[in-house]
């Protein structure tokens, strides 16, 4: 199955007092990579979560977003500096006595004092939460892969359409190439007749045409193009992560088309080569999206 490298998948899971959601977005990338964004208390869990995603992906950059609605991410603990609080209380009583104040110290005011009362948060490992996140990640990556496969089918269909167009252009080029030398001979003959009244040296004309025929022969390029078309179809049919192979073939297609354009020395073939390069460029754009 051909896959695109772009896609999206998401999933949410709830169990008891735990609620998690996972989102995955993938874009084109030469290799495979996961950029994770998790709540800070879950950073220890990042590598395991990445591996869960990567085992389903061959190429592409994945953006992973995890959100958790739970009080179980951290363990909160209240700490009171009793010796320091004793000093504050003693100071409050001294102030009351010194200034003959009637009000008693408000206990809640002591909670506002720096360093007296502090809340410490400690990261905790929760197996139930981890399992829930993995479950959501598995469902999200399944949705991501399904979308990538649907887009992959469209990419493959579009590529094959352009391959069909290229094959037709190559057939037309092959037909024109068979008459390139005769057309050149006619042009050369007419040009010489225009320039001179002398009798033509037929052997010289034949020699010039032979040199031109050798220089403009595109038989090998056409044969290789046909071979590349067949390989392209076979690779698409094989499925899997074939993006790199197809990218290499596209480069070869472009190289052969350029060679034909430089060798043919015929305006009709040149027009066909321009159309070939346009189709090849469209294939290249699609192949860059294939995993």
From Swiss-Prot:
UniProt KW DNA repair keyword: no
NCBIfam families: YicC/YloC family endoribonuclease
Cofactors demanded by this protein: a divalent metal cation
Annotated phenotype, changing residue 258 to A: Reduced endoribonuclease activity (11.1% of wild-type)
InterPro entries associated with the record: YicC-like_C, YicC-like_N, YicC/YloC-like
EC number, as in UniProt: 3.1.26.-
Cofactor note: Mn(2+) gives highest endonuclease activity in vitro, followed by Mg(2+) and to a lesser extent by Co(2+).
Source organism: Bacillus subtilis (strain 168)
Task performed by this protein: Endonucleolytically cleaves ssRNA generating a 3'-OH and (presumably) a 5'-phosphate group. Cleaves preferentially at U residues, has no activity on dsRNA or dsDNA. Upon expression in E.coli contributes to the degradation of small RNA (sRNA) RhyB.
Gene Ontology annotations of biological process type: RNA catabolic process
MF GO annotations: RNA endonuclease activity, producing 5'-phosphomonoesters
Subunit structure and binding partners: Oligomerizes, perhaps as a hexamer. Might interact with PNPase (pnp) in E.coli.
Recorded name of the encoding gene: yloC
Name used for this protein in its record: Endoribonuclease YloC
Recorded superkingdom: Bacteria
Key words of the record: Endonuclease, Hydrolase, Nuclease
Recorded family membership: Belongs to the YicC/YloC family.
Keyword Manganese listed: no
Disruption-associated phenotype: No visible phenotype, no effect on sporulation. A quintuple ribonuclease deletion mutant (pnp, rph, rnr, yhaM, yloC) is viable.
């Amino acid at each position: 199955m051909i896959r695109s490298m772009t896609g999206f998948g998401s999933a949410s899971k709830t169990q008891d007092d735990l609620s998690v959601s996972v989102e995955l977005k993938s874009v084109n990338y030469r290799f495979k990579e996961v950029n994770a964004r998790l709540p800070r208390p879950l950073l220890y869990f990042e590598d395991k979560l990445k591996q869960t995603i990567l085992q389903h992906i061959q190429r592409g950059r994945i953006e992973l977003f995890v959100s958790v609605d739970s009080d179980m991410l951290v363990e909160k603990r209240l700490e009171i500096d009793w010796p320091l609080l004793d000093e504050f209380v003693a100071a409050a009583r001294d102030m009351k006595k010194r200034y003959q104040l009637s009000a008693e110290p408000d206990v809640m005011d002591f909670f506002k004092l720096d360093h007296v009362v502090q809340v410490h948060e400690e990261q905790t490992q929760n197996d139930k939460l981890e399992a829930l996140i993995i479950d959501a990640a598995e469902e999200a990556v399944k949705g991501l892969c399904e979308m990538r496969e649907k887009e992959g089918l469209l990419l493959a269909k579009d590529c094959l359409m352009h391959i069909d167009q290229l094959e037709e252009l190559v057939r037309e080029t092959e037909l024109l190439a068979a008459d390139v030398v005769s057309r050149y001979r006619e042009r050369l003959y007419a040009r010489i007749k225009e320039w001179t009244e002398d009798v033509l040296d037929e052997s010289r004309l034949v020699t010039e045409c032979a040199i031109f025929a050798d220089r403009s022969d595109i038989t090998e390029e056409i044969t290789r193009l046909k071979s590349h078309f067949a390989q392209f179809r076979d690779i698409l049919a094989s499925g899997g992560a074939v993006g790199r192979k197809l990218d290499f073939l596209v480069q070869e297609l472009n190289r052969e088309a350029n060679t034909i354009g430089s060798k043919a020395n015929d305006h009709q073939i040149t027009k066909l080569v321009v159309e070939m390069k346009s189709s090849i460029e469209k294939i290249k754009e699609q192949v860059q999206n294939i995993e």
